[in-house]
């Protein structure tokens, strides 16, 4: 056991150095304490009235490695999160029910977030109609200059997709050409760390998305199919991956969608290698009318090809993050009853069980993790995503506290009374801190 723990600690240090540690002004990499200090100072600047409490949490639990803030806050804590609050969150979820999904999803991937998304038929059916072949072949050319930012890259995707899926006549008038000269060259440094991938990565994604759209138009389709939406976003995800960003994604689909059900069968890795960038799962409604044959088909495919998976729900509007451990509800209903879709987020902290001394120490670690998670939930400047997403995040203010290395002390972790006490401690601390910083307590 001690050997395994030592090996895990070494792997953890490697992961930290390669994925989370920044290069300092003196050219050296941050130590773990440096990185956590960066996160601590970010919270203290935002909440000066909680300066002492934040200091105590970091000194007592974070610096010793008992509690970890969200992975993304470790990676981007400081200026990067101040500029783009969505970098605080590990994962997100939404639906392909609006043209802006493709651009927003790209922006989130480039921000470091994982993306769960639904291509269920009832969501994809909400997209506008495709332009006709005659409309496409008789358009005026329009040059779009791509700005050198993640917003600029995302907007390029939006300009392209809305020209094929227009919501008005003006959007259908132009064939879009792209000007890439403002995009910094491959290898140039970027402000959040690392180097730029260069314009070719984006150009390839744009042209592959255009190919799918042109193919749909050439086939006389009036609407996109879920499999086409899936493939479009996978080409976009590949661009994020080649830009040294996360491309963690999961696609949820209708269980009667045969094309999605068989998306990873046959020689898909040769014909459609982009599909490797997402897990796919059928979303099965538990309403008492479940179709056993559909579930049998899923299992048969999974035994042969490893996918698809299945995602049980009581509401088809529920979604999940790529890890599949949390339900997310990315819609908002206003006072007039109008429903709009946006993005819901996963807000997760971690307790390292191997560093926990006893049940009382675990209880205190849970309170510390809940304290940090509640602070994290207050970062709701959603920027490119707009007001609907801001309202969803502020309404839910979700909080997750997970435990890693549970088998290092199973007697403590699997004790029912201890777990109930920990759950109550997380809830109570969340309510306390949410009131202090004037946000909603976690919806769940």
Regions found by a protein language model. Give the residues of each.
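Extended catalytic cores of very large enzyme megasubunits
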Residues: 1-444
């Amino acid at each position: 056991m001690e050997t395994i723990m030592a090996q895990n600690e070494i792997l953890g240090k490697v992961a930290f150095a390669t994925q989370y540690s920044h290069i300092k002004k003196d050219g050296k990499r941050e130590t773990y304490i440096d990185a956590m200090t960066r996160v601590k100072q970010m919270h203290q600047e935002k909440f000066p009235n909680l300066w002492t409490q934040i200091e105590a949490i970091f000194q007592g639990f974070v610096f010793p490695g008992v509690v970890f803030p969200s992975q993304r806050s470790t990676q981007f804590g400081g200026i990067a999160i101040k500029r783009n609050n969505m970098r605080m969150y590990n994962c997100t979820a939404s639906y392909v029910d609006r043209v802006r999904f493709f651009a927003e999803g790209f922006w989130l991937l480039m921000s470091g977030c994982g993306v769960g998304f639904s291509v269920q038929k009832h969501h994809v059916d909400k997209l506008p109609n495709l332009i006709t072949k005659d409309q496409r072949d008789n358009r005026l050319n329009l040059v779009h200059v791509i700005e050198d930012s993640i917003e600029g890259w995302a907007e390029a995707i939006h300009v392209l997709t809305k020209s094929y899926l227009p919501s008005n006549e003006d959007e259908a008038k132009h064939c879009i050409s792209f000007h890439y000269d403002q995009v910094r060259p491959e290898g140039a440094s970027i402000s959040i760390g690392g180097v730029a991938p260069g314009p070719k990565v984006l150009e390839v994604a744009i042209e592959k998305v255009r190919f799918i759209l042109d193919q749909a138009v050439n086939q006389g389709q009036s609407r996109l199919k879920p499999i086409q939406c899936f493939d479009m976003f996978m080409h976009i995800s590949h661009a994020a991956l080649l830009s040294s960003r996360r491309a963690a994604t999961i696609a949820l689909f209708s269980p009667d969608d045969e094309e999605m059900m068989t998306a990873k069968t046959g020689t898909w890795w040769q014909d459609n290698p982009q599909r490797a960038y997402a897990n796919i799962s059928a979303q099965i409604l538990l309403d008492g009318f479940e179709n056993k044959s559909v579930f049998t088909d899923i299992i048969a495919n999974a035994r042969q090809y490893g996918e698809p998976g299945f995602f049980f729900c009581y509401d088809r509007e529920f979604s999940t993050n790529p890890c599949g451990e949390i339900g997310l509800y990315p819609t908002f209903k206003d006072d007039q009853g109008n429903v709009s879709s946006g993005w819901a987020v996963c807000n997760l902290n971690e307790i390292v069980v191997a560093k926990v001394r006893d049940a009382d120490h675990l209880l205190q670690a849970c309170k510390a993790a809940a304290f940090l998670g509640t602070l994290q939930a207050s970062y709701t400047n959603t920027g490119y995503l707009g007001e609907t997403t801001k309202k969803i995040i502020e309404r839910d203010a979700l909080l997750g506290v997970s435990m890693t290395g549970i088998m290092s002390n199973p007697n403590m972790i699997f004790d029912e009374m201890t777990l109930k006490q920990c759950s109550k401690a997380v809830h109570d601390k969340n309510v306390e801190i949410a009131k202090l910083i004037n946000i909603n307590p976690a919806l769940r």
